[in-house]
Design a protein with these regions (language model features):
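Conserved catalytic core of sirtuin-type NAD+-dependent deacylases
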Residues: 1-238
Length: 238
């Protein structure tokens, strides 16, 4: 255990008010590619860049191509929670962790047993008919052909926030509240490149800001503790 991890353990042991803010790097150890990493979706062969394909305009204009990309790249049905997801669920059960705020859409925090998860960008596990509102699970989307259709004939839209779409205000508001009231705030596996989610960190008022990331963050966060490494690998030591 490194000195940094020992310091983190001391912080965790001494509090019952942790808030965890995570991004794609939390799920890479479950085999889900990081959208922006060098070997992630950005650098894989496709006609248009992922940000274009995953935009509201593209979804409306080219639904067939949108769903082809969506099924191929964003639906990771076989993925299982890793050490990071499991440790966070354990902390929640112990009453130490108050909330997980995630930029991920894979539902792995809930699969690990976490109850209070704020999904800033929605979830691939929820899908709704745009016409009648009927719910469909991820398996239906995965195994449907072309543009998925409801029994009523309406198009089914994944409950994920696309580029050009706004984040759910209620979820954002709750995230701000948890961050403001946190004793220890852990930011992990995120480049903090996407707004408004990335802007949430500025609401933290405490002095126990921990950053766990494989690569150093560009932003001057004034972190009190920085650990360079994989999130699951790090949390598994605690």
């Amino acid at each position: 255990m490194t000195d940094e991890v020992k310091k983190l353990k001391k912080l965790i042991d001494g509090t019952d008010n942790i808030v965890f803010f995570g991004g794609a790097g939390v799920s890479t150890e479950s085999g889900i590619p990081d959208f922006r990493s060098v070997d992630g979706l950005y650098h894989q062969q496709w006609d248009d860049p992922p940000e274009t394909i995953l935009s509201h305009t593209y979804y409306e204009r080219y639904p067939e191509k949108f769903f082809a990309f969506y099924r191929a790249k964003l639906l990771c049905e076989g993925a299982k929670p890793n050490a990071a997801h499991l440790k966070l669920a354990e902390w929640e059960k112990e009453g130490k962790l108050k909330a997980v705020i995630t930029q991920n859409i894979d539902g792995l925090h809930q699969a690990a047993g976490s109850k209070n998860v704020l999904e800033l960008h929605g979830s691939t596990l929820r899908n709704y008919c745009e016409k009648c509102g009927k719910f469909y699970d991820v398996s239906y989307i995965k195994h449907s052909q072309g543009v998925p259709r409801c029994t009523c004939g309406g198009r089914i839209k994944p409950d994920v926030v696309l580029y050009e779409e706004g984040l759910d205000e209620k979820t954002l508001y709750r995230a701000v509240e948890y961050i403001q009231e946190a004793d220890v705030l852990i930011i992990a596996g995120t480049s903090l490149a996407v707004y408004p989610a990335a802007g949430l960190v500025r609401y933290y008022r405490g002095h126990k800001l921990v950053v766990i990331n494989k690569t150093p963050l560009d932003r001057g966060l004034g972190a009190d503790l920085v650990i360079t490494g994989a999130v699951g690998e790090t949390l598994a030591q605690l």
